[in-house]
């Protein structure tokens, strides 16, 4: 994440870049300077997850009540100081960064293997030095923050770009995160989440102007430096030989800087003393050894340019560029936002550098009447760049649609929704269209559906952090799921990627239209799901799976746009059909909230996975019931005798099921409120682990329920619903002591490790190992198809 080696360099060689600041005091200055405007901090939420998750237990599936309280305290600290928070989450992985994403996932796999080795050898949780965030943490953090009344957005491209863009365009007090890319973007000040003291609101501010002063560079040079050092777009190996040439000729080597630090100093020295001499006179490829990586390099530099910005390293003065006075024209005659334009010398067309064609939010802007901000805010005193504003009150198109009733927020303005090819060709006119397409063949996106209204609704829910994966499926047909705490050596439990795949396949059928199972043509979704044995060299190519909905599968227009009360029943029918549980509708309707969604999930799990036992079911139900009577403090102080590796995997498996419910619920038009399947309402990892250990030892149900008679009736009712639904699928749930009996489980089962891809299309009892893990016989194929 960020620029290679820059974090260590700042800490060891240039500590003066880091200034201790009090955010409360900065907010007071901001209020005095901009009367009537609320000081706002834009938060890179993905950088903050580790900071927010302070619970001692992390391997058991997550301490969700404790985590929710931590988020509430975090928000309250800023609210009491009169500071508004805007949260951004990663919404998708950009094609150009897939390799980096894969590299991190494979590294995480190795870390998870060490975690399970430790658990099985020590029967304890590893120390914080091996900490791995619980599955689903990012997804459920979005919903937690929305529940706490916070504005929460999910990105349509790389989140750090949208964070930096929002911070610049809305004159934010600063950015809160932990990513050196925020030192590179020319945006508002950057605060460290890792150094934040919540009680005093004191933290470290990293000043890009002081960084430039130390390196002898200008702020506009930082994107060039970042690409030469290596980042998520330009691999570190791309300019390795160039960096060492710079180092070999660098005369001011510092002993305390270390090798990486001196490389940064040497490259900066080369930029300031050599490249600056020919800037604007020579093309950048004439000054740097770009070779076949020219397109990737340009993409890397351009990725740091926020709306309205341009790089002097991508501008060629002699050719076709219009003057500064000619650059500022209006994109929309009704809009007051000015957008930089340039003339393409080949096509004689005006092309916008960076625009946001679908801005839907009107945000009060606080503009400094003076060109410079306060010195303490660490902004470039030489910068006279105006912050683009969008003040058109009529630029928000109204869309009549079914929306999540829990949502009240609008789209953020000033965000580029796609990588802007025109911007690259505009800022570098001799850079041809063919070069752009060579840069990344998947940039030119073809959506999976053509209905613009449906895509608008999906996009809105995506940006508002109300849905999960739906827009990705509709827009690009490509989704991903990060690592889960799964034991690659445990052959008795299938990976969550396979267990929930049939549900996802039915969602694909719902979202991508009608087609028949087994057809050679039709939509295919690329799944980048991490599971044991998956090298992630290519995505799994997964086809939709037909489902049966009573009365026929309703269209997305009906599910998402209809206001008719009767449609709510159709939404629920469709949700149950995605889990193949239509026959259990009546029983599930009788289950009270918030246990209904959990009950649905348990039925699906026990039908799918033969190796789940009666003891497992007792533990799942008992923890859900006992959770209703526990305070956060009681859950925090719960002590476990030891840690069981199988229980660790079961906890993660259930939480991944809850994230699958988020996907299905949003795809079906929100038949259930999100509170039905938020983990802090239905699951606690440590409590489940306790019940699992007790159930494994053969404790009576009364003991599992802590002698609470009122819970006993609910327990037996929930158990009856699950067992009855499973029996309809010929799945008999028995205790582990009966596993050797020839009459256990489902007829025709293939023994341990058996799970079903679907119960109605001839896949019953298919071994999960054949679906892609273990030996991976299909690896000889370029992409795997399902």
Swiss-Prot record:
Keywords: Activator, Differentiation, Nucleus, Transcription, Transcription regulation. Residues 371-413, 738-786 are annotated as: Disordered. Its main location: nucleus. It is found in: Nucleus. Coiled coil: none annotated. GO terms for biological process: fat cell differentiation; peroxisome proliferator activated receptor signaling pathway. Residues 750-771 have a biased composition (Polar residues). InterPro entries: Coact_PPARg, PIN-like_dom_sf. Residues 1-561 are annotated as: Mediates transactivation of PPARG. One of its GO terms (cellular component) is nucleus. Ubiquitously expressed (at protein level). Induction: Up-regulated in differentiating adipocytes (at protein level). Belongs to the constitutive coactivator of PPAR-gamma family. Functions as a transactivator of PPARG and ESR1. Functions in adipogenesis through PPARG activation. PANTHER family: CONSTITUTIVE COACTIVATOR OF PEROXISOME PROLIFERATOR-ACTIVATED RECEPTOR GAMMA. Interacts with ESR1 and RXRA. Interacts with PPARG; in a ligand-independent manner. This is Constitutive coactivator of peroxisome proliferator-activated receptor gamma. It comes from Mus musculus (Mouse). The gene is Fam120b.
């Amino acid at each position: 994440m960020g620029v290679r080696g820059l974090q260590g360099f700042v800490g060891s060689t240039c500590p003066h870049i880091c200034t201790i600041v009090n955010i409360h005091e900065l907010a007071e200055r901001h209020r005095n300077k901009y009367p009537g405007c609320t000081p706002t901090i834009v938060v890179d939420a993905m950088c903050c997850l580790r900071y927010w998750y302070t619970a001692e237990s992390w391997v058991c599936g997550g301490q969700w009540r404790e985590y929710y309280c931590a988020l509430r305290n975090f928000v309250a600290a800023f609210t009491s100081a009169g500071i508004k928070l805007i949260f951004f989450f990663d919404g998708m992985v950009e094609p150009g960064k897939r390799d980096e994403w894969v590299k991190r996932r494979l590294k995480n796999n190795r870390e998870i293997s060490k975690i399970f080795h430790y658990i099985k050898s020590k029967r304890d949780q590893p120390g914080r030095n091996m900490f791995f965030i619980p599955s689903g943490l990012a997804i459920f953090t979005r919903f937690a923050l929305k529940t706490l009344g916070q504005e929460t957005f999910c990105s349509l491209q790389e989140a750090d770009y949208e964070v930096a863009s929002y911070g610049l365009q809305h004159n934010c007090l600063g950015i809160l995160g932990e990513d050196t890319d925020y030192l590179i973007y020319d945006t508002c000040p950057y605060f460290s989440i890792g150094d934040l003291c919540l009680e005093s609101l004191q933290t470290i501010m990293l000043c890009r102007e002081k960084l430039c002063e130390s390196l002898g560079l200008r702020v506009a040079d930082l994107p060039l430096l970042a690409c030469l050092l290596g980042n998520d777009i330009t691999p570190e190996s791309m300019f390795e030989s160039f960096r060492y040439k710079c180092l070999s000729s660098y005369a001011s080597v510092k002993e305390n800087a270390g090798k990486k630090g001196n490389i940064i100093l040497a490259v900066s020295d080369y930029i300031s003393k050599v490249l600056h001499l020919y800037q604007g006179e020579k093309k950048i490829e004439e000054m740097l050894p770009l070779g076949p990586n020219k397109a990737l390099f340009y993409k890397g530099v351009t990725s740091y340019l926020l709306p309205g910005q341009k790089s002097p390293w991508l501008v060629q003065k002699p050719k076709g560029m219009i003057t500064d006075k000619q650059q500022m024209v209006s994109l929309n005659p009704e809009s007051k936002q000015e957008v930089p334009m340039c003339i393409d010398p080949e096509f004689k067309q005006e092309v916008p550098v960076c625009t946001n064609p679908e801005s839907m939010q009107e945000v009060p802007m606080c503009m400094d009447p003076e060109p410079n901000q306060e010195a303490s805010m660490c902004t470039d005193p030489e910068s006279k760049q105006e912050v683009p504003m969008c003040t058109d009150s009529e630029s928000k198109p109204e869309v009549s649609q079914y929306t999540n009733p829990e949502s009240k927020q609008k789209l953020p303005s000033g965000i580029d929704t796609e990588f802007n090819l025109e911007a690259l060709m505009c800022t570098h006119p001799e850079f041809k269209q063919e070069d752009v397409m060579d840069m990344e063949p998947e940039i030119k996106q073809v959506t999976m559906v053509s209905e613009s209204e449906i895509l608008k609704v999906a996009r809105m829910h995506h940006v508002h952090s109300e849905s999960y994966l739906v827009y990705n499926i509709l827009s690009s047909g490509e989704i991903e799921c990060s690592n889960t705490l799964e034991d690659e050596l445990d052959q008795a439990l299938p990976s969550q990627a396979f267990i929930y795949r049939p549900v996802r396949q039915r969602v694909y059928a719902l979202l991508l239209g009608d087609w028949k199972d087994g057809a050679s043509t039709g939509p295919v979704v690329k799944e980048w799901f991490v599971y044991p044995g998956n090298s992630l060299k290519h995505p799994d190519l997964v086809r939709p799976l037909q489902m049966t909905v009573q009365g026929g599968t309703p269209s997305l227009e009906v599910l998402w746009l209809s206001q008719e009360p009767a449609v709510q029943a159709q939404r629920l029918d469709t949700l149950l059909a995605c889990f193949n549980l239509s026959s259990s509708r009546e029983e599930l309707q009788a289950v009270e909230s918030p246990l209904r969604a959990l009950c649905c999930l348990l039925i699906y799990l026990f039908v799918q996975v033969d190796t789940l036992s009666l003891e497992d079911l007792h533990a799942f139900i008992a923890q859900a019931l006992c959770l209703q009577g526990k305070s956060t403090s009681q859950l925090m102080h719960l002590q476990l005798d030891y840690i069981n590796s199988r229980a660790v995997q079961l906890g993660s498996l259930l939480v991944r099921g809850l994230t699958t419910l988020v996907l299905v619920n949003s795809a079906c038009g929100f038949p259930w409120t999100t509170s039905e399947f938020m983990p802090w309402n239905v699951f606690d990892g440590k409590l489940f682990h306790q019940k699992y250990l007790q159930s494994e030892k053969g404790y009576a149900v009364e003991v599992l329920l802590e002698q609470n008679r009122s819970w006993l009736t609910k327990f037996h009712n929930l158990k009856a619903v699950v067992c009855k639904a499973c029996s309809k699928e010929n799945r008999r749930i028995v205790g582990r002591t009966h596993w050797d009996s020839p009459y256990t489980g489902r007829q025709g089962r293939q023994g341990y490790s058996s799970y079903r891809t679907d119960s109605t299309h001839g896949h019953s009892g298919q071994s999960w190992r054949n679906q892609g893990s273990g030996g991976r016989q299909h690896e000889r194929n370029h992409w795997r198809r399902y």
